[in-house]
Each structure stands twice: as structure tokens, then as C-alpha cells.
Curated annotation (Swiss-Prot):
This is DNA-directed RNA polymerase subunit beta'. GO terms for molecular function: DNA binding; DNA-directed RNA polymerase activity; magnesium ion binding; zinc ion binding. The RNAP catalytic core consists of 2 alpha, 1 beta, 1 beta' and 1 omega subunit. When a sigma factor is associated with the core the holoenzyme is formed, which can initiate transcription. The lineage of its organism: Bacteria, Pseudomonadati, Pseudomonadota, Betaproteobacteria, Burkholderiales. Binds 1 Mg(2+) ion per subunit. It catalyses: RNA(n) + a ribonucleoside 5'-triphosphate = RNA(n+1) + diphosphate. Its EC number is 2.7.7.6. Zn(2+) 2 binds at residues 820, 894, 901, 904. PANTHER family: DNA-DIRECTED RNA POLYMERASE, DNA-DIRECTED RNA POLYMERASE SUBUNIT BETA. The gene is rpoC. Zn(2+) 1 binds at residues 70, 72, 85, 88. Keywords: DNA-directed RNA polymerase, Magnesium, Metal-binding, Nucleotidyltransferase, Transcription, Transferase, Zinc. The keyword Transit peptide does not apply. It comes from Cupriavidus taiwanensis (strain DSM 17343 / BCRC 17206 / CCUG 44338 / CIP 107171 / LMG 19424 / R1).
Length: 1414
């Protein structure tokens, strides 16, 4: 019996470990793992199906096939456990040891491990300092390598061909030097390396050299050698002498019916290796000719290569069916590999899936579970109950009972599922709310019932969607599901803090209809004593639902909270002017909400705001009950309303004909202008598209105006307008279904259509769906509509990949402490663009913690202290006292080393309170950004292919009244007509109020005409400037006579004849299209004064030269007199595509991957004064002289737009040449805060265009992870190498250590890595390997002998432990503390024994995870 108990104990012994180390295994280590050498390629005997002895499935090496039974059958049963059979040599034990026992193959000749040879950069090449090509020639027996030059002039590791070798042997005599071929040669070279000496040498050379390339090369090699030195791995272990053999159960051979076998490819690969190895052994014994042996060695090397990584070098080995065999490397990498398929994506039992249907009668925390499904899922619980109740005595009996489905079983099922939550999941699970817990309610039928309010969170609809059910088994799991995942505890979106349980569609329509008011409805003006009276009147049809009446309504105001924290309310009765519907609806209002929140038409946005208000004021429980009541009322009222739609509801505006006729006339006018040569074809197209766009908008407006209002007679008999009760209008207005743009297509005109490439077809569809489309119109529509569908299919995959990269880069970011105590933060202002407030300050700082006191600008008193979490009331206060900017904490400046602190993160948006310790904020951020990704269409902003374009701005007007101020960068000249023409490229006009506070700012483009003066007082709506939106001018800043230079027809310019109009213009042509001789010359204009001298720039002796960009149309003639501010040429802008080219998802991905844009802007490296040096061929030379008088030169291509002028003072990081900004430059010159602003604003721009709300902090979390590595500049006394990239936390730890010892810390600069690169360069090799480029990551980690501390979530999922987040964080902390105390105790005991002069017993102090390489 005791033996049996021991057996059970032995099974439970799970291993505790703190880290996982990877390294290279020495030949001795491989032999120590092995249970025997595999000598034969045979697998199993074809007659007996028993494994062959010494073969690949040998039972003697790998263990028995049946539990506790040797192969020949001499020993069976448990009693012989551990006996080794003398006949067949098999140990009697469990058959599952065949999953863990390894074998080995003694290779007759050493072979190189292909990963260390071919995985770039080649590790073998680095260590030996040889090129990959040379090493390959040696390994594959094409050349000799010198091992020992002896007394000869040859050099060590010199390569020579066979002929050379023979010649040298003749020359110096044999035995004077040693040269070898194949892996043996490489192994000898590796053995001969003295790592310590090499490191010293390289360090010395690093000090001596100055060339960047050499430093890089040395640093790389130094890193590898130091890794070898540190990890105690010998370089010669990269050459295999012994090959381990995988346990047979992991490469199974399964008999199929019909006598055939299915086998893992690995068996084939192993067989090839064994065959070639045995043949080589035999050839060596027979002392075969060198050339034959060499060939066999080469083949062995190739067989081993294929086994490890098939297809990495040369052609892949193929099986019988001509497909490449799947090698060990393929087993672990990619989507179907070990990491992603089996470790990160396990299938779970106790789960089921079925179609979902709507469950309108359910409470929010319930779901309907089909009886049969529940019976299957809860089987173990039912069995247990049957046994405890004594109905069944054994499991078998219980099983029978359940299968016969007796009435008692259903009763027990009811009992078992009571308060046992189940988890529902809808794929794709894009964010936290994709899995929620519900209490099951048993239902008949086979479909799962889902509560309508959670559909938004699951993104589910009932058109055939399926959902999966999972049962949490343990008590802890049930508890977590109930407290953290229950649907009624997740009412806010973690992405933005808005309610997720907002009603949609019919419910919204019902509530909207109920709360609308109507002029002169039945019973208008009646007054009621209370709500029950209203209901009586309504039920007796004395009043209509929308009639305006007066009702006495009781509101409950919050007085205070009692000792238990329960709210106390005081009733307050008032007479309210309202409608019948609103009065009736007010019955469901929770206490603490005023009636005013309901006393308006409830559109979707209003309902969302209503639920939000309820949540903030009345708490979670009341809100959930309220939402459920709203839902029930909405469904009931929508049914009672009886709204339907008919074709007659789509009213076509009478003005449509006239608008279209006018537009056509305008288009004809432009065609005429084009014919007579006044405009180019491009300009004509742009104008036509604009005209039709405007016409479409006008028709839409006329249609909406007609739909919106209807004429009714009021009580006095006057005809008045009231909001329409047109069904289609109500659906769109309430937000239940459809939008103005869709109604426009139904009843207005469909408008312009886009081609699949995004360009707009200039003939619009003037018809709408009510009138019907003709064949041509239908054909044009199909274009865009089909592209929309194709796009959707393609972009889903892209969006998923973005989410995956984001999750991978942030997965180890968890809130680990309450406060890191930093005093850094970021100043938040309202986001203003073009004078419009896009995002108010209150929205940006809500849920953040203040860094500094917030001061009232009027009284200068402290309004809010530092370290306060800003909630709704406090941001309201900030709004009211008129604070313009607030400094708040941000994840970017958090000082916590491994993780984040709660104060820097602020409010957990999904819960509405300060974030808890252990929250995996990284993953939440990744999900919040990735989840709407699918909605970010790839620049198809089509509604069924209809084109929508940003109307081109051609003027700017003031929104506020105040005073105009121009910034210092604004420069303008007065032209002959007395107009002010702007000649600066970065000038801005500000408008300030009476207190001098900036209200708005507008960029004024180059070439615009200013309509106001600096310092002028203006009213709101005043135009500040106008410009031509369709062309960019080149303006002369000086007056004089034109003198063309290099304007040669056919060389730099071309005469463009318009075939239609017969007129010609000069167009500057692209330098690439010219011949080599003429490439350097650029067309330009010089100005001559009255004496024929060149006009100079004032204060310099440079002549005024004005260059023309490619594509410019020159509008002046040679010798023409020009005035200041006159246009010399115009550059037509690109034709309008549908919105922005890099819109949507690609733009977001580009920002997070931190890609440098092509033709990036040039930023000033220093603060100083600009001047122009001598131009070189094709480049202009811009010089910035800093404050110390040092000159910094920039060479800029001539076609680039320089934004600064001579003598301008620029600040470090200011843009001096136009172009898209490069995030790396922003980081280097302006710092982390500016970079964060840039990325956050750019990402938000993309999402905002789609109407998606994401809180800034999520993007900041990602940026923090992109900035987590730094580059060492000066190593000080630390262990780093110059130019090395290390984890910020590691560097800070090392610097702390060095400073503590009184030495010099390292200096560093910040690095910005794209998300893919950041994921791959993480400290955890397990996480990186499971992400991408598995081979490269593992190769590097093995050479470095890396240790994975299992800090992140992913690593812990992979090794199968609780993740260090949420409840798992507490578990891991407790475990670590326990271990530390045990270690201390062991130490104390050891010291005590020492003091007693007793010879202490050997205490093994290897903590978990130390010791052997894994």
C-alpha cells in the first residue's frame, strides 16, 4: 500500500521554478540525457509491429509500449515496477516515459549546427571572424582551412582550395602545417579561440579606431564573445558530435487501416541521418579513398541540416509525395507551430458552442442555456450530486442515470447551475468585453439566448452568429468570473469609459418616439396631479403620447450618505411642462436623477449620456436595473408606436431639378474655359468634382429640410412648422438606423462615385434609389460598392495583425505599485485645429492624476491639489474657472521599473475608479487600439461606394471676436494692387481675447492674400485670408525685370500644347527625364534692376534666384517687368482622391512601427540663425549658426520647399524643410514629451475621422513600450558596450549599482523602436520567440545563455503558470516572499551550525531554476 501512495506522491510533485535558461548543450550533456544510442534506421517490425531493437522506436532505449509490461511479455503488472527484463532489456514502467526519454546518435564526423551557421548574422562567422561564404566552403568540403600554420608564412584560418593545398604541401613539405576540411576543421578553429584574449584585443581596438563601420563590427563581435564568456558556453559546442533523438511518442508512427502507416516527417529525417552515419562509419573502417569519405561526410552534414531546419540551405529534402519534410525548426515556428498552436492557443474542455438568439426577457446578468448543453457541460457536478444524494452509488451508475435523462436529473441540474456563472465568448475576441460571465437560465431549444444590451460589447447580431460557452470549474474561478467578469459588472468600455450597455435600434426608436412632442396633440395643455392620472388618461385615449401637458412629478434629491454609506434621498414635487410619454417613462428613473435628464427627445447619444450620468451618480447596481427597465420600455413602446416605412416616406425635394440644372450649366462653363485654354485639364477636373460635390450637398440639405419639418395647425389655428413624424426621418434622427448620408442616397441624389483606386469619377449619379438608376448609373455604382466588399475581406487580416503586434509589445506592462513618486508629467491643453476645439480640455484630463496644483487664474488660489484624481466634478470645476492647461501624470514618465504605477495611469476606464494593482493595462491598451481597427477602413470612406471628400478650404475666417496677431514667422509683401501677399511658409495668425488669452490660431499658407492687419480688432466671422486651393503659386519677393536661366525648351522645360485648346504653356520637366549632361542644371529666374544689374538679397551679395519646381507652369515671359508679390508660376495640386492616401489602418501601423517617412522634413539640429551658403549642383546649402558661433550645414535638394528665410532665428527641432515629420528626429531634438504628443495626435486624427473614441492614455502606454530601450553613449564603469541597446530598466539598475560603489554611471540616449522591433528585442526570449522570427531569437538566446525571468504574461502562459496580473500578481508575490523567507531560514540554520563548530551538512543552495540548461 505504501508503495502505491508513494507512486501518487511522485506524480503530484510539481516543479517550482523562477526562471528558464536556454543554452547550448555540450556533447556530454546530450549523452547524459540519452537512454541509449540509436544505431539502426529501422522503426518497427512489419510483421509483429513491435519496435526494432536499437532502432528509432526501440523499447530498450525509450521505454515500454504498454504500461508496466516489458516487450517480450516476461514481466507484467505493477509488482515488477522498475525491473529491467534480462531477455529484451526493457525497463518495466509507465508507457508515457516514451514521451520524455531521449536517445542519441554518435556522429562519425562532427557536423555544424545549421542555425548557428545560416541564421543571420552568422554566429559562427562572428566568432571566427570569417565570412559565411568561406565557412560554407570549408563545411561542405570545397576548401581547406589552415588550423596550425607552424613555421610557414600561412595565416591561421586562411582558406585554400584543394589544388592550393597540394601545391603548398609540396612547397613546405607535409606535416609542416595543419589544414583541414569540413566541420572538424571549424571545430578545431573554435577550440583554439582564447575568448579572454580576444575580448581584450577587441576592447583595445575599439578604443583605437574612429571609423563608425569598424566600431559597429567590433561591438557586434564583442557582444557575442562576451556572451560566451559570461554564460560559460564553449564555442565548439556549435559543432555537433552527438545528435539527440526526440522521444518516439513526440514523432509517432500510427498504423492506418489497410496496413499503411502514417508517420511524422521527423522519422524520415532521422532515418536519413542514421543511414548516412552508418555508411560513413563503414567507409572509415574500410579506409575508403579520401574523396568517397568526403562525399559521405558532406551528405551527413546535409542530412543533419535538413533534420534541424529543412530548406534553410540548398533544396529542401522531400518525402515520397514530393513535398518538403517538416523539420524540427518548422515544428516550433509560425501559426501552426508549438508556440502559437499548442502553448498560447490551447483548446479547453467543459465548453460548447451554439447559435445565439435574442433573449428580451433576460436580466442583464443572465443568459439562456439550452438544457441539453447544460446537461453535458455540468456532468461532473451532476454526478457528484447524484452520489451525495445516494441516488447513484458509482460514477457508472450516475452516468447511466444522466444518459436516461430522468426527471430527477433535471431537478439536480437546476440546483447545480444556480449561481454558477458560465462564460460566453464571441469570436473574434477583440477586447476584454468579448468574454463575459452570465448566470445561466435553462431553456428549451438548442440556441443560446443573449441579452440584447451586451450585443454592442460582443459586436454580436442575430443573423446566425455563434457563441461559445465555458464553465469555470474551481471555486476561485467561479468567484473571479462572478466578481470581475459578470456582464452587470462590465458596463463601461475600457477604451474610452463610455457605457457599453447602451440600447440600439428598435429600443432607441421606441424611447425616441415616446419622448417626442407634438403641436396640438389630443389633450394638449391638460394638467395632471400625478403620473398614475396621466396613465389613466392615456389608457382611456384622452391624450396622445406626444401631447404637451403639465404634470406634478416627484424627484428624489441626494441629501447625504448614512453610516453604512447608503444614500439618503429627499422627495421634491414640482409641476413640470412635459409630454405624456416622458411623464410615463419617468417612473423608471432611479432615485438621485432629476427629471430634466428625461425631459427631452431621447436620441441614441442622449440615452448614452443618460446611462453615463446614472452610473456616475447612482452607482453600478442602480444603473444596471435602470438599463434593463429602459430596454423593456423601449421594446414595448416601439411595438406600440407601429412605425413602418413606405416608398412615399422618401420625399424627393422639388428643388432638386433646379440645383442639378445649375450645376450642369457651371460644368459646361468650365468646359468652355478649358477649350479656350484659360484652365488646364487638371484644374477643370478639380472644379467639376467640386461643383458636383456642392450640388450633392445642396440636394441633400434641401431634402433634409423637407423631411425634417412638416406644417401643422396649432390650437390658435395658425399654421406652424414642427419636427416631422416621417418614419425615415425619425429613424435617422434618433440614431436607431441609417444616417443623413444614406437617406440622401434614397431620396436626394447618389452623388459622386469613387473608382477602386480612390479617384473620383467626374460624372455623378443624379438619380436616387427612389427614382431608380439607369444602366450606366448602376454600372458606375458597382465600381465602388464591390471595392468596399473586397476591402473588408482584406483589411480584417491586417487589423488582426496590428492587434497582435500591439499585444505583443505591451503584454508585460502591469500596474505593480500604487505610486512611483515622480514629479514629471505632461501639460494638457484643449486640442484646437483651425480655430475649432476638437477635443475639450475636460475630456483630455478626465480620469488623470494632477502633478502640480491647479491654480485659479482669477484669484491665484489653489483650486485642486497635486496628486488628485480628476473626476467629472473636478473637470467641471476646472472648466468653470477657466484654466487653459493642466499638468497631469502620464504612463510615459512613470518611474516604476518593471511595470507602471496606479497614479501615473489614472482611472481604469472600464471600472470608473483609480486603477487596481495587477491590472494588465498594456493588454487593455493594445485591445483598445486594435479593436476598432477593423472599422478603420482602408481609405474607403464610401457609403456603398459613394465618394466623400474633404471640401477644399480656400479661405480662413475667425470663429471668435478679438484681436489679430501674427506670429514671428509670418512674412508678407504688398503687391501692386495694394494686397498683402504671404511669403512665409510657416506663418500663423492668432486671435486673442480682451485678456490676451489665445482663442484660436490659423496657419496661413504661402501665396495667400491677407485681408487683415496685425493688431486689428475683428468680429467673429471675418475672413482673415484667401488663396487658390487648386494651385500653389511661386511669388516674387522683389520687383525687377525677369531674366530666365536654364529655361531651355526640351531640356528643362517642355512646351505643353493642349490638343483641345491649341494653346501652349511652359512646364518644368523632371530632371530624371533629362540626359546626364543636363541633369545638374535647374530652371530659375534672376531679377535685373533698371541698370540691368542682378538684384541682390538685401544685406548680402547673393543674387535673388527663384527656382522652379518640377511640374510648375511658368506664367511670366523672359524680359517681363514684375512687381513685388506677383505670381511667377503655379504648381497644380494633385487631383483629389477620396480622402487621405495613408489614411486608416496603414497610417496607424506606420506610426506605431516608427517608420521614417520618405522625403521627411528636415528639423533644425540647433538653435541659431539661418543663412544660405553657396549652392552646389542640385542642392542648396543652408547654414545654421548657433549661439556659440558654430556653423551647422544642411544640404537640401533644390526641389524641396525651404520654410525659413535668410536671417531667421530658428529653435532646435523647428521644421526648416517641408515634409512629413520623422518621429526619430522629434525624439532626438525635442524629447519624449513632444514625441508622445506627435504620435498621440496623429493616431487620434485617424480614429477621430471614423468617429472612434479612444483615450489618449492607451496610446501613451504603447509609446512607453516603444521607448523602453536606450542606446549607450558613454559606458562609464558599467558592464555595457558603447552603442549597445539595452532595456531601460536594466540600465537604471546597473547605474544604481555603479553609483552605489562610487563609480561613473553610463550615459545614454533614448531610442524609439517600432512595435515589431520592440517585441523582438524584449528581454524575454520566450515571448520574442513566440512572436516572430523564432529561429533567430532562439539562436541568439542560446548563444547568450539567456535567462528568462518570466516577468510578462506571455511567458507565464507558455510555461503554464498563473499570469503575474490580476489575482495572479498576489499569488506570485506571496510565493516569492515565501521562498525568500525559506532561504533566509536555511541560511540562519547554516550559520548557527557553523558557530557550533559542527561540520555542517551540505546544504544545496541552488534555488529553483538554476543548474542545468533547459
Amino acid at each position: 500500500m505504501k508503495a502505491l501512495l508513494d507512486l501518487f506522491k511522485q506524480v503530484q510533485q510539481e516543479e517550482q521554478f523562477d526562471a528558464i535558461k536556454i543554452g547550448l548543450a555540450s556533447p556530454e550533456k546530450i549523452r547524459s540525457w540519452s537512454y541509449g544510442e540509436v544505431k539502426k534506421p529501422e522503426t518497427i517490425n512489419y510483421r509483429t509491429f513491435k519496435p526494432e531493437r536499437d532502432g528509432l522506436f526501440c523499447a530498450k532505449i525509450f521505454g515500454p509500449i504498454k504500461d508496466y509490461e516489458c516487450l517480450c511479455g516476461k514481466y507484467k503488472r505493477l509488482k515488477h515496477r522498475g525491473v529491467i527484463c534480462e531477455k529484451c532489456g526493457v525497463e518495466v514502467t509507465l508507457a508515457k516515459v516514451r514521451r520524455e526519454r531521449m536517445g542519441h546518435i554518435e556522429l562519425a564526423a562532427p557536423t555544424a549546427h545549421i542555425w548557428f551557421l545560416k541564421s543571420l548574422p552568422s554566429r559562427l562567422g562572428m566568432v571566427l571572424d570569417m565570412t559565411l561564404r568561406d565557412i560554407e566552403r570549408v563545411l561542405y568540403f570545397e576548401a581547406f582551412v589552415v588550423i596550425e600554420p607552424g613555421m610557414t608564412p600561412l595565416k591561421k584560418s586562411q582558406i585554400m582550395s584543394e589544388d592550393d593545398y597540394l601545391a603548398k604541401c609540396d612547397e613546405y613539405g607535409e606535416g609542416e602545417f595543419v589544414a583541414m576540411m569540413g566541420a572538424e576543421g571549424i571545430r578545431e578553429l573554435l577550440r583554439g579561440i582564447d575568448i579572454e584574449k580576444q575580448i581584450e584585443q577587441i576592447r583595445a581596438e575599439l578604443q583605437a579606431t574612429g571609423s563608425e563601420a569598424k566600431i559597429k563590427k567590433f561591438a557586434k563581435r564583442l557582444k557575442v564573445l562576451e556572451a560566451f564568456q559570461r554564460s560559460g558556453i564553449k564555442p565548439e559546442w556549435m559543432i555537433l558530435e552527438v545528435l539527440p533523438v526526440l522521444p518516439p511518442e513526440l514523432r509517432p508512427l500510427v498504423p492506418l487501416d489497410g496496413g499503411r502507416f502514417a508517420t511524422s516527417d521527423l522519422n524520415d529525417l532521422y532515418r536519413r541521418v542514421i543511414n548516412r552515419n552508418n555508411r560513413l562509419k563503414r567507409l572509415l573502417e574500410l579506409k575508403a579513398p579520401e574523396i568517397i569519405v568526403r562525399n559521405e561526410k558532406r551528405m551527413l552534414q546535409e542530412a543533419v541540416d535538413s533534420l534541424l531546419d529543412n530548406g534553410r540551405r540548398g533544396k529542401a529534402m522531400t518525402g515520397a509525395n514530393k513535398r518538403p519534410l517538416k523539420s524540427l525548426a518548422e515544428m516550433i515556428k509560425g501559426k501552426g507551430g508549438r508556440f502559437r498552436q499548442n502553448l498560447l492557443g490551447k483548446r479547453v474542455d467543459y465548453s460548447g458552442r451554439s447559435v445565439i438568439v435574442v433573449g428580451p426577457t433576460l436580466k442583464l446578468h443572465q443568459c439562456g442555456l439550452p438544457k441539453l448543453m447544460a446537461l453535458e457541460l455540468f456532468k461532473p457536478f451532476i454526478f457528484h450530486k447524484l452520489e451525495t444524494m445516494g441516488i447513484a452509488t458509482t460514477i457508472k451508475a450516475a452516468k447511466k442515470e444522466v444518459e436516461s435523462q430522468t426527471p430527477v436529473v433535471w431537478d439536480i441540474l437546476e440546483e447545480v447551475i444556480r449561481e454558477h456563472p458560465v462564460m460566453l465568448n464571441r469570436a473574434p475576441t477583440l477586447h476584454r468585453l468579448g468574454i463575459q460571465a452570465f448566470e445561466p437560465v435553462l431553456i428549451e431549444g438548442k440556441a443560446i439566448q443573449l441579452h440584447p444590451l451586451v450585443c454592442a460589447a460582443f459586436n454580436a447580431d442575430f443573423d446566425g452568429d455563434q457563441m461559445a460557452v465555458h464553465v469555470p470549474l474551481s471555486l476561485e474561478a467561479q468567484m473571479e468570473a462572478r466578481t470581475l467578469m459578470l456582464a452587470s459588472n462590465n458596463v463601461l468600455f475600457p477604451a474610452n469609459g463610455d457605457p457599453s450597455i447602451v440600447p440600439s435600434q428598435d429600443v432607441v426608436l421606441g424611447l425616441y418616439y415616446t419622448t417626442r412632442d407634438k403641436i396640438n396633440g389630443k389633450g394638449e395643455g391638460m394638467t395632471f396631479a400625478d403620473i398614475s392620472e396621466v396613465i389613466r388618461a392615456y389608457e382611456n385615449k384622452e391624450v396622445e403620447l406626444a401631447s404637451r401637458v403639465n404634470v406634478r412629478i416627484t424627484e428624489y434629491e441626494l441629501v447625504d450618505k448614512d453610516a453604512e454609506g447608503d444614500a439618503r434621498f429627499a422627495p421634491k414635487v414640482t409641476l413640470q411642462a412635459t409630454t405624456v410619454g416622458r411623464a410615463i417613462l419617468s417612473e423608471i428613473l432611479p432615485k438621485g436623477l432629476p427629471f430634466s435628464v428625461l425631459n427631452k427627445p431621447l436620441k441614441k447619444k442622449e440615452i448614452s449620456r443618460l446611462i453615463n450620468t446614472a452610473f456616475r451618480r447612482c452607482g453600478l447596481r442602480e444603473t444596471v436595473i435602470f438599463a434593463d427597465k429602459l430596454l423593456q420600455s423601449g421594446f414595448r413602446l416601439a411595438t406600440r408606436a407601429g412605425i413602418s416605412i413606405a416608398i412615399d416616406d422618401m420625399l424627393v425635394p422639388p428643388a432638386k431639378e433646379k440645383i442639378i440644372a445649375e450645376a450642369s450649366a457651371k460644368v459646361k462653363e468650365y468646359d468652355k474655359q478649358y477649350m479656350s485654354g484659360l484652365v488646364t485639364d487638371q484644374e477643370r477636373y478639380n472644379n467639376v468634382v467640386d461643383i458636383w460635390g456642392a450640388a450633392g450637398d445642396q440636394v441633400g440639405k434641401a431634402m433634409m429640410e423637407q423631411l425634417q419639418h412638416e406644417d401643422v395647425v396649432d390650437r390658435e389655428g395658425k399654421t406652424v412648422k414642427q419636427e416631422s413624424f416621417n418614419s425615415i426621418y425619425m429613424m435617422a434622427d434618433s440614431g436607431a438606423r441609417g444616417s443623413a448620408a444614406q437617406i440622401r442616397q434614397l431620396a436626394g441624389m447618389r452623388g459622386l462615385m469613387a473608382k477602386p483606386d480612390g479617384s473620383i469619377i467626374e460624372t455623378p449619379i443624379t438619380a436616387n434609389f427612389r427614382e431608380g438608376l439607369n444602366v450606366l448609373q448602376y454600372f458606375i455604382s458597382t465600381h465602388g460598392a464591390r471595392k468596399g466588399l473586397a476591402d473588408t475581406a482584406l483589411k480584417t487580416a491586417n487589423s488582426g495583425y496590428l492587434t497582435r503586434r500591439l499585444v505583443d509589445v505591451t503584454q508585460d506592462l502591469v500596474v505593480v505599485e500604487d505610486d512611483c513618486g515622480t514629479s514629471n508629467g505632461v501639460a494638457m491643453k484643449a486640442l484646437v485645429e483651425g480655430g475649432e476645439v476638437i477635443e475639450a480640455l475636460r475630456d483630455r484630463i478626465l480620469g488623470r492624476v494632477t502633478v502640480a496644483d491647479v491654480v485659479n487664474p482669477e484669484t491665484q488660489e489653489t483650486a485642486i491639489e497635486a496628486g488628485t484624481l480628476l473626476d467629472e466634478d473636478l473637470v467641471e470645476l476646472i472648466d468653470n474657472i477657466g484654466v487653459d492647461e493642466v499638468k497631469v501624470r502620464t504612463p510615459l514618465s512613470c518611474d516604476t521599473r518593471y511595470g507602471l504605477c496606479a497614479k501615473c495611469y489614472g482611472r481604469d476606464l472600464g471600472r470608473g475608479v483609480l486603477v487596481n494593482s495587477g491590472e494588465a493595462v498594456g493588454v487593455i491598451a493594445a485591445q483598445s487600439i486594435g479593436e476598432p481597427g477593423t472599422q478603420l477602413t482602408m481609405r474607403t470612406f464610401h457609403i456603398g461606394g459613394a465618394a466623400s471628400r474633404a471640401a477644399v478650404a480656400s479661405s480662413v475666417e475667425a470663429k471668435a471676436t478679438g484681436t489679430v496677431r501674427f506670429t514671428a514667422t509670418m512674412r508678407y509683401v504688398t503687391n501692386a494692387k495694394g494686397e498683402l501677399i504671404v511669403i512665409s511658409r510657416s506663418g500663423e495668425a492668432l486671435i486673442t481675447d480682451d485678456h490676451g488669452r489665445e482663442r484660436e490660431r490659423h496657419k496661413i499658407p504661402y501665396g495667400a492674400t491677407l485681408l487683415v492687419q496685425d493688431g486689428q480688432a475683428i468680429k467673429a466671422g471675418t475672413q482673415l485670408a484667401t488663396w487658390d486651393a487648386l494651385t500653389r503659386p511661386i511669388v516674387s519677393e522683389y520687383s525687377g525685370t525677369i531674366k530666365f536661366e536654364n529655361v531651355e525648351e526640351g531640356v528643362t522645360v517642355a512646351k505643353q500644347m493642349d490638343e483641345v485648346t491649341g494653346l501652349s504653356t511652359l512646364v518644368v520637366i523632371d530632371a530624371k527625364r533629362r540626359t546626364a549632361a543636363t541633369k545638374g542644371i535647374r530652371p530659375q529666374v534672376k531679377l535685373l534692376d533698371a541698370n540691368g544689374q542682378e538684384v541682390k538679397i538685401p544685406g548680402t551679395d547673393h543674387s535673388v534666384t527663384i527656382g522652379f519646381q518640377v511640374g510648375a507652369l511658368i506664367t511670366v515671359k523672359d524680359g517681363q517687368q514684375v512687381h513685388v508679390g506677383e505670381v511667377l508660376a503655379r504648381i497644380p495640386t494633385e487631383s483629389q482622391k477620396t480622402r487621405d492616401i495613408t489614411g486608416g489602418l496603414p497610417r496607424v501601423a506606420e506610426l506605431f512601427e516608427a517608420r521614417s517617412p520618405k522625403d521627411a522634413a528636415v528639423l533644425a539640429e540647433v538653435t541659431g540663425t539661418t543663412s544660405f551658403g553657396k549652392d552646389t549642383k542640385g542642392k542648396q546649402r543652408l547654414v545654421i549658426t548657433d549661439l556659440d558661433g558654430n556653423a551647422h550645414e544642411f544640404l537640401i535638394a533644390k526641389e524641396k520647399q525651404v520654410l525659413v528665410h535668410d536671417g531667421q532665428v530658428v529653435n532646435k527641432g523647428e521644421m526648416i524643410v517641408e515634409g512629413p515629420a520623422d518621429p526619430h528626429d522629434i525624439l532626438r531634438l525635442k524629447g519624449i514629451e513632444e514625441l508622445a504628443h506627435y504620435i498621440v495626435d496623429e493616431v487620434q486624427d485617424v480614429y477621430r475621422l471614423q468617429g472612434v473614441k479612444i483615450n489618449d492614455k492607451h496610446i501613451e502606454v504603447i509609446v512607453r513600450q516603444m521607448l523602453r530601450r536606450v542606446q549607450i553613449v558613454d559606458v562609464g564603469d558599467t558592464k555595457f558596450i558603447p552603442g549597445e541597446q539595452v532595456e531601460r530598466s536594466e540600465l537604471l539598475d546597473e547605474n544604481d549599482r555603479v553609483i552605489a560603489e562610487g563609480k561613473r554611471p553610463a550615459t545614454y540616449e533614448n531610442l524609439l523602436l517600432g512595435i515589431t522591433k520592440a517585441s523582438l528585442s524584449t528581454d524575454s526570449f520566450i515571448s520574442a520567440a513566440s512572436f516572430q522570427e523564432t529561429t533567430r531569437v532562439l539562436t541568439e538566446a542560446a548563444i547568450m545563455g539567456k535567462t528568462d525571468d518570466l516577468r510578462g504574461l506571455k511567458e507565464n502562459v507558455i510555461v503554464g503558470r498563473l499570469i503575474p496580473a490580476g489575482t495572479g500578481l498576489a499569488y506570485h508575490r506571496a510565493r516569492k516572499a515565501r521562498e525568500a523567507s525559506e532561504r533566509e531560514r536555511a541560511q540562519a540554520i547554516a550559520e548557527e551550525e557553523q558557530s557550533l563548530f559542527i561540520e555542517p551538512p551540505v546544504v544545496q543552495a541552488t534555488t529553483e531554476g538554476e543548474g542545468d540548461n533547459v
